[in-house]
A protein has these predicted regions:
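Acyl-donor binding region in acyl/amide transferases
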Residues: 16-30, 115-116, 127-197, 203
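Short Asp/Glu-rich motifs
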Residues: 52, 187-188, 208
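Alpha-helix boundary/capping residues
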Residues: 36-37, 95, 99, 192-196
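Short coil/loop linkers at secondary-structure junctions
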Residues: 39-40, 102, 174, 195
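Well-ordered beta-strand positions enriched in small/hydrophobic/aromatic, beta-favoring residues
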Residues: 52-54, 119, 176
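Acyl-donor-binding surface of acyltransferase catalytic domains
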Residues: 1-75, 79
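Long, intrinsically disordered, low-complexity Ser/Thr/Pro-rich regulatory/activation regions
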Residues: 201, 206-209
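A conserved beta-strand-loop-helix scaffold within acyl/acetyltransferase catalytic domains
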Residues: 44-46, 66-153, 183
Length: 210
């Protein structure tokens, strides 16, 4: 891999230098890179950045009775994003608007990735959520989740991620990766059963953050 250090926004705090690190893959696969904490970003070409990535370790998941009861009320299907873009995009755009999230530009940029699949979640035949993800060889990489805000008791954000993690397990794959996990931006990820974080050298349990 070709490593790039971006000093354009770099700075020094207490005599420590902070800058961004990126890589352009050479012979590495997607799985190789995400297993080492790198995350893809669409650029010409695709470059990968280092962040506090997180993943769901299925062997460490322990679901509460409440969560199991919620999951029992839901069904999901795995579909190709290509061909249902209009339906999925409309659901996501409405979700962004209702949550007042300025994410449409990033969502559209991510739509340029190849091999995007969609998990469609339903309750009593009504669509209550979508999650887009990339189906890799050894793992899956979750991208974005949107859900119906009229079902707060279902905790559909976390529940959708757990459903996708279970689908990953049923595929006999290793883990579901779900991008960054910084607590000031993604506090809900700290609550996901089985969550692990990339600390720069190895994967660690969320217990060290409690």
């Amino acid at each position: 891999m070709k490593i790039i250090f971006d000093h354009s926004q770099g700075h020094v705090i207490n005599d420590r230098v902070f800058c961004e690190a990126f890589v352009i893959p050479e012979n590495e696969t997607y799985d190789d890179l995400i297993e080492l904490g790198w995350l893809p970003n669409v650029q010409p070409p695709i470059y990968w950045y280092q962040s506090q990535s997180c993943r769901i370790n299925n062997s460490k998941i322990s679901l509460s009775y409440k969560r199991r009861k919620i999951i029992s009320q839901l069904e999901y299907k795995i579909l190709q994003y290509e061909g249902i873009e209009e339906e999925v995009d409309s659901f996501f755009y409405d979700y962004f608007d209702n949550k007042k999230l300025d994410l449409k530009k990033f969502y559209d940029l991510n739509s340029q990735f190849s091999n995007i699949q969609v998990m469609k979640v339903t309750k009593d035949d009504k669509v209550v959520g979508y999650t887009r993800f990339q189906n890799l060889t050894r793992n899956n990489l979750g991208m974005e989740t949107a859900y119906d805000l009229n079902f707060p008791r279902l905790s559909l954000g976390i529940t959708s991620i757990l459903l996708l993690s279970d689908y990953t397990r049923l595929q006999n794959k290793n883990n579901l990766y779900i991008y960054e996990s910084y607590n000031d931006y993604f506090p809900y990820k700290m609550e996901i059963p089985g969550i692990e974080f990339w600390e720069g050298e190895k994967w660690v349990s969320n217990n060290i953050y409690k």
